Regions:
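N-terminal beta-loop-helix "entrance" segment that forms/cooperates
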Residues: 1-15
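Glycine/serine-rich phosphate-binding loop and adjoining beta1-alpha1 elements at the start
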Residues: 34-111
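Short glycine-/small-residue-rich Rossmann-like dinucleotide-binding loops
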Residues: 32-33, 52-53, 161-165
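Rossmann-like adenosine-cofactor binding region
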Residues: 142-184
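Short acidic low-complexity segments
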Residues: 13-24, 140-153
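NAD(P)-binding Rossmann-fold cofactor-contacting core
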Residues: 1-5, 116, 121, 130-147
Length: 184
């Protein structure tokens, strides 16, 4: 992981094992449970914890229930009203922006950016965008109409919204795409 040898993890107290051995343990920590392809290999009574996003991912929820697993969803863990992984969410926003600009081959300065969302991920995205000189406007659910009106002026749109699965529409439609600036 991250080009760090297993020995380095062992020096810090970790037990490194095969996937097969890990899946026999009572508790499995997987930060990206939503991407898990091994749930069918788990046994009734085992526990998994990480970013489950069960509400947004019915297939994962179904597998957890069918296999009699317990799940602890990090996205549902709060202490005194604050998400316990708030800084992780902020870092996710920062990293996503950096990665997107790297893929695009442009630098954020001289770009106009719309950030949709008001949570920690949006906060991280906005922080790094400001640090790199972008012009940023933030929108929320209550300003969706304004966002759609102003959409054509943006070079970049960063979506940091945890989607309401009951909604059947889209924030940006195919028609909206026709009015956006062309990418490179």
């Amino acid at each position: 992981i991250l080009q760090i040898e297993d020995d380095e993890f062992v020096k810090c107290g970790a037990h490194v094992c095969s996937r097969e051995e890990a899946l026999t343990k009572d508790i499995i920590c997987d930060p990206k449970v939503g991407d898990a392809e091994y749930l069918e290999q788990m046994n009734e009574g085992q526990t998994i914890f990480g970013w489950v996003h069960a509400t947004q991912n019915y297939d994962i929820t179904e597998k957890i229930v069918q296999h009699g697993l317990s799940a602890y969803a990090w996205e549902s863990m709060y202490e005194k009203g604050r998400h316990i992984f708030w800084r992780n969410n902020e870092l996710a926003g920062e990293a996503a922006v950096l990665h997107a600009y790297q893929c695009w081959g442009e630098m954020p300065y001289r770009t106009k950016v719309a950030v949709i969302g008001r949570g920690n991920t949006a906060g991280g995205a906005i922080k790094i965008l400001h640090m790199l000189g972008a012009s940023v406007r933030q929108y929320s659910r209550s300003t969706e109409e304004l966002f759609k009106e102003e959409l054509p002026m943006f070079d970049v749109v960063v979506n940091c919204v945890l989607w309401d699965v009951k909604r059947k529409d889209h924030i940006i439609t195919k028609e909206d795409l026709k009015h956006m600036k062309k990418g490179h």
